[in-house]
Regions:
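Helical coiled-coil/dimerization "stalks"
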Residues: 466-512
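Active-site anion-handling motifs in enzyme catalytic cores
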Residues: 1-465
């Protein structure tokens, strides 16, 4: 049986719905195709509980080689790994590196598979640089072992330090095939002479098999509450200050005008802490405290239950990526409140696949007329426009399935495997009158530029300070070793002098 390693961001203490969903979707397809799937995870026991195996056999699991967060330390860790791969001799490892045994086990684990699939995500950037390097490490071992690597459903950047970009480019160029999930990532690949598929998110066809499945809560089992007959699903995490009250007022207005009660649904949270009432839940609590209309706040749930709730809504409002994926895949409109360039790039990508890229505005536009008008437009989509959402979803899933068929055929070594054509461009659905659309486009562009500039400045500064701290630590260690050496020499000299004095006294005593 063909053994394939699927790499996703799973097994985290803080459960992330989108990361789990992308990995599950990819793993299920490959298992159904008759392959033995090995899942890279941070927590084997957790992943065994949360992920059910498809196909004819259970999943196997392999621990990640965990990288430090600091840029200097992760760069050095990757260099030490390659030194071992080149020479077969384990180099001296700083304290921040994984142990020699962990590195050996990691290398042997990858060498035991027939192919590697780096499943979708938004980890290929400096913002989450340690996750980028963990994937680069897997690809590096595979490259030395001549094991094919396939990169699926990724977002590239937008923030990359020059060194991180070098690491990323080497990883992508070593891959057999690359698929990205938005047009901006595809253009980045073209600019860097990388052949890539203009693809879609790996969870675009996510199937919620067991909505009753629960997470490991610290105190008691958390049940999905009874939901209103008609509701707006809200997932936000970047809201603070006056924006809390402005979003609360907007949701109150949605209830009074459309009869849609707010259901707050988190996408990140630690189920073992406060019964899952962490992460997004905290932001949701703040908003409901300022509302006068009915609202339900739900702790973090398993991906299966989460998807069902998104797809039962009349509308989804979000500042996160995967709520838009799950909403639009069911033909339900979404309105995005964008906090930064990182989110703008990703959500614009998935919204663009459905022609809904105009239904976005910066988060700081809360308190203006634009969010309210976007919501009104989303809720008043014509029957034909809603039908077009379903047609576009068919195109999205058709491409994803064609990509996976190519992936499976390539993993099996079938020479006739051909990469599909990229996703077609959808006609944009109008969301605002022209004057407001011009304003909204301008503020979105301004947010993108300023946030991207801030992000790039942060990445460079973070790397510089990291290397300064590392070199300072190296200097201090060298200084300590020098002082210890000096002390040891002084001690040895003192011992020699003492022995000489004792010898002279002994000789002198003979002549008394």
């Amino acid at each position: 049986m063909t053994r394939v390693l699927v790499v996703g961001d799973i097994g985290q203490p803080v459960y992330h719905v989108g990361d789990e969903a992308m990995t599950i979707s990819t793993a299920e397809y490959l298992a159904d195709a008759g392959m033995q799937v090995i899942l890279a995870t941070r927590d084997t026991d957790q992943s065994k509980r949360y992920l059910g195996a498809g196909g004819s056999s259970a999943y196997e699991y392999m621990p990640f080689l965990l990288f430090p967060w600091a840029p200097a330390e992760r760069e050095i860790t990757l260099e030490r790994l390659e030194e071992f791969l080149v020479s077969g001799v384990m180099p001296n490892l700083p304290d921040f590196c994984p142990s020699a045994q962990q590195i050996r086990d990691f290398v042997e684990g990858i060498q035991s598979v027939d192919a590697v699939v780096i499943s979708g995500g938004g980890n290929l950037n400096s913002r989450y640089g340690w996750l980028l390097y963990e994937r680069a490490a897997i690809a590096l071992v595979a490259q030395y072992a001549k094991i094919p690597v396939f990169v699926s459903g990724q977002s590239i950047g937008p923030v990359l330090s020059p060194r991180d970009e070098e690491v990323l480019l080497r990883m992508l160029r070593s891959a057999t095939s690359v698929a990205v999930r938005e047009r901006s990532s595809y253009e980045w690949c073209r600019e860097h002479d990388l052949k890539a598929l203009a693809g879609v998110d790996d969870a675009s066809d996510y199937r919620a098999h067991t909505p009753e499945i629960t997470l490991d809560y610290a105190d008691a089992r958390v049940e999905v509450p009874e939901l209103p007959e008609r509701y707006v699903c809200v997932t936000v995490h970047e809201v603070s200050g006056s924006k809390v009250h402005e979003l609360a007022a907007l949701l109150d207005k949605i209830y009074s005008e459309y009869g849609l009660a707010a259901v707050f649904l988190g996408h990140m949270g630690d189920p073992a802490s406060e019964g899952g009432r962490t992460g997004d839940y905290k932001a949701h609590e703040l908003i409901t405290a300022s509302m006068t209309s009915p609202a339900a706040v739900i702790p973090i749930l398993h991906a299966d239950a989460t998807v069902r709730i998104h797809q039962g809504a009349a509308l989804n409002i979000t500042d996160r990526y995967h709520p838009a994926v799950f909403s639009l895949s069911a033909g339900i409109p979404a309105v995005a409140l964008v906090p930064d360039a990182f989110t703008e790039m990703r959500i614009c990508g998935v919204m663009g696949h459905y022609g809904m890229q105009n239904f976005m505005t910066p988060l700081h536009m809360l308190g203006t007329d634009i969010p309210e008008k976007l919501i009104a437009s989303a809720l008043s989509l014509s029957r034909g426009q809603r039908q077009e959402l379903r047609v576009r979803h068919e195109a999205v899933t058709a491409l994803l399935h064609a990509w996976r068929e190519y992936l499976a055929a390539s993993v099996r070594g079938e020479r006739q495997a051909h990469m599909p054509e990229g996703i077609s461009v959808a006609a944009a659905v109008p969301a605002l009158e022209p004057s407001l659309e011009a304003i909204n486009s301008a503020v979105r562009e301004l947010l993108l530029k300023t946030s991207l500039a801030e992000g790039n400045e942060w990445a460079l500064s973070d790397r510089m300070h990291s290397w300064e701290a590392h070199m300072r630590g190296e200097f201090e260690r060298a200084e300590d070793e020098l002082q210890a050496l000096k002390r040891s020499r002084m001690v040895r000299a003192a011992h020699r002098t003492s022995r000489q004095v004792q010898a002279m006294r002994h000789i002198g005593s003979r002549f008394r």
